[in-house]
Each structure stands twice: as C-alpha cells, then as structure tokens.
Amino acid sequence: MVGRNSAIAAGVCGALFIGYCIYFDRKRRSDPNFKNRLRERRKKQKLAKERAGLSKLPDLKDAEAVQKFFLEEIQLGEELLAQGDYEKGVDHLTNAIAVCGQPQQLLQVLQQTLPPPVFQMLLTKLPTISQRIVSAQSLAEDDVE
C-alpha cells in the first residue's frame, strides 16, 4: 500500500514537472523579445568578464613573452588614456607595472607624465592587480606540479 502511494505521488510530481517544462517552453517560444534579451544578457556577461578579468597573462618565466606583454600593455594603456578612457588605460598600465622588472623606475616616469588624479588611480589599483598576477602565477605553478 505504501509503495503504491509512493509510486502515485512520484508519478504526479513527474507529470507536474513535465507540464511546467512544456508551459515554460511554450511561453519562451512565443515571446518575441526572448532572443533579444538573451543576446543582451550574454553581451553584458561578456563585457563584465572582460572588465573583471586580466589580459591574458604570459608565462612569467619566458622573458620574451613577458617583454611582449609589457610593451602591449603600455601601448594599450597610453592609447586608452589618450582617448579619455582612464579606467581601462590605468588597468593596462598596472598590468605592465606588475610584470615590469624595474617597477620603481617605471612608476617615476609615469608620475612625471600622467596627471596627478590618473597617477593616484594607478597607485590605488596596483596592489590588487599585482596580487591577481601573483595568484595566477601560483595557480599556473600548481597546474604544472
């Protein structure tokens, strides 16, 4: 008797679940803005991921890759600052400083060339970017081991 009641309850729950799936699918298919909203959501997620994530980090043991990354980040940072996009420009410059072999000298040069508010923004972001690079490097080393 108990087994029969359990089977009936499971069957009813399964039927309700399938009914809800059919209802949701029909509602989704009949909505003309569903695809547009889905595209917008994916676009926002992609932009958020680009903002939050670092540029693809080079292998820090490969001097040539680090130098190429450094030069690209400096160039991108300068271009973005020239366009007025200070936030992204500072992000790229902090990436360059984090992988730089002589960060103190680079900071002195940037202090002389950047406006004081932009340089302060750079100094504010530097610890977090450096920490991300160190953690990314340690994760890469863990993968090798």
UniProtKB/Swiss-Prot annotation:
Pfam families: MAS20 (PF02064)
Stretches assigned to the Mitochondrial intermembrane side: 1-6
Ranges in the topological domain labelled Cytoplasmic: 25-145
Record InterPro entries: MAS20, MAS20_rcpt_metazoan, Tom20_dom_sf
Residue spans crossing the bilayer: 7-24
Crosslink site: Glycyl lysine isopeptide (Lys-Gly) (interchain with G-Cter in ubiquitin): K35, K56, K61, K68
UniProt keywords, alphabetically: Isopeptide bond, Membrane, Mitochondrion, Mitochondrion outer membrane, Phosphoprotein, Protein transport, Transmembrane, Transmembrane helix, Transport, Ubl conjugation
Localization annotation: Mitochondrion outer membrane
Protein name: Mitochondrial import receptor subunit TOM20 homolog
Gene: Tomm20
